[in-house]
A protein has these predicted regions:
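Catalytic machinery of carbohydrate-active enzymes
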Residues: 1-417
Length: 417
């Protein structure tokens, strides 16, 4: 009881501090934008060439996985088919692009986002390259567009024509400044649409044609024809603490799962922090650990053979869904309709667990709740290991110590449609 009262008292203070930090971050970003824009005056005058198109996609791996099926629409459309198309991409997903999507564009420019944000020399080198290419048109299809990345790269390219989606950051001043840089703006009819469906609609609006699939689809080159096995993969990290299920909970879940089911539990992650967490979980549970040891493409191959995938709200969710594997998301509710409510989006084979505090708030405000941002670290920690195990068993349709259908020689792979 005392703990509950203390949490209720701490929550408003934590949210107040977070909102103050957000306002300060917005002010810093706006100041940096003006400063960096001034630096761009050193670039030579633009000389755009007819039918040169630049597509700017600088967000992270998960976002790209929800976009990539729509990229080829540009080449196949009557509007852009005769253009020389260049993709300005985030180097973090270069491996997946090269293996699976290289024929969607004519050329690429890769950006190391960390170096871009931290090194003035590297940043100017990218800008100079964009200015030298002479693009007639720039399309920025991201739903949430960073001023310092997408928009400054659009300014560096200096096209005759700019096309984008109306920006939807939480700061109106940011969005107004961003949107003024483009001549054509896509205004989504449904602000609550899942990210995959938003990307589909943007491509249809900008190209006149749309991807025919109803869910993300990733077909790996030289993929093994081996049926999915009995192993589950647990992606144990996330890039913010409020989205990260604690190591203690993962340990509780793995011990409970292994007491009831056969097959390996494999820990995955990428960052140094995730590798350290995975090592701790491995020491406590004996789970297999591949965190930080495999390439993105090899990770995708392993996911394609998994019985199921469990993850916080990370790129791993979108990778697993794209490979049509049963996927359980342990989420805090932030941007839930865009990234974690797959079931509502009509995409099968995915289940999501939210904190009780989030579910209570959503029931009280169903019509006003699509832009939820008030998650704390304690919220996701409140999701119990028993709840996760129960939902996983329902998702994969397995009883304790029952091998999955794939391992018994069935000719189906389970999961969604």
């Amino acid at each position: 009881m005392i703990d509950s009262i203390m949490k209720l008292e701490v929550r408003p203070v934590s949210l107040l501090l977070r909102r103050r930090h957000s306002r300060l971050e917005c002010a810093r970003t706006l100041a940096a934008f003006e400063e960096w824009r001034e630096v761009q005056r050193q670039l030579h005058a633009p000389h755009p060439h007819s039918k040169r198109l630049l597509i700017v996609r600088l967000d992270d791996i998960g976002d790209y996985l929800l976009f990539r099926n729509h990229l080829s629409m540009y080449r196949h459309s009557a509007r852009w088919g005769a253009h020389a198309i260049t993709l300005l991409g985030n180097a973090s997903w270069k491996e997946i692009f090269t293996a699976c999507d290289g024929d969607a564009v004519d050329d690429t420019i890769w950006v190391d986002k960390g170096a871009y944000l931290s090194s003035a020399a590297y940043r100017f080198q990218i800008w100079a390259m964009l200015r030298a290419r002479g693009f007639e048109t720039v399309i920025a299809p991201s739903r949430t567009r960073p001023l310092l990345l997408d928009d400054l790269c659009r300014l560096a390219a200096a096209p005759v024509h700019g096309i984008a989606s109306a920006n939807n950051y939480v700061h109106p001043a940011w969005n107004r400044l961003s949107d003024e840089l483009y001549q054509e703006l896509f205004v989504p009819g449904d602000a609550r649409a899942h990210e995959f469906h938003f990307n589909r609609r943007f491509a249809a609006w900008s190209c006149g044609i749309r991807f025919g699939g109803i869910r993300p689809l990733l077909e790996l080159p030289d993929a093994s024809l081996t049926a999915a096995g009995p192993d589950i993969i647990c992606f144990i990290g996330a890039n913010t603490r409020s989205r990260r299920w604690p190591a203690k909970r993962w340990i509780e879940f793995i011990k409970a799962y292994r007491s009831r089911h056969d097959g390996r539990v494999i820990l995955a992650g990428g960052s140094q922090a995730e590798q350290e967490i995975a090592a701790r979980i491995q020491a406590e549970t004996g789970a297999d650990n591949i965190a930080g040891t495999v390439s993105l493409l090899e990770l995708a191959r392993r996911v394609s053979r998994a019985r199921a995938v469990l993850s916080n709200d990370t790129m791993a969710v979108h990778l697993s869904v794209s490979l049509n594997r049963p996927t359980l998301i342990i989420a805090n509710g932030v941007n839930y309709q865009r990234f974690t409510d797959y079931d509502t989006a009509g995409i099968e084979g995915v289940a999501t667990l939210y904190p009780r505090v989030f579910d209570r708030k959503r029931r009280r405000r169903p019509d006003l709740f699509h832009h939820y941002t008030d998650a704390l670290t304690s919220d996701i920690a409140s999701i119990g290991a028993g709840d996760v195990l129960e939902r996983l068993e329902a998702l994969i349709g397995a009883r304790p110590h029952e091998a999955p259908a794939e391992a018994r020689g069935a000719d189906t792979q389970g999961g969604g449609s």
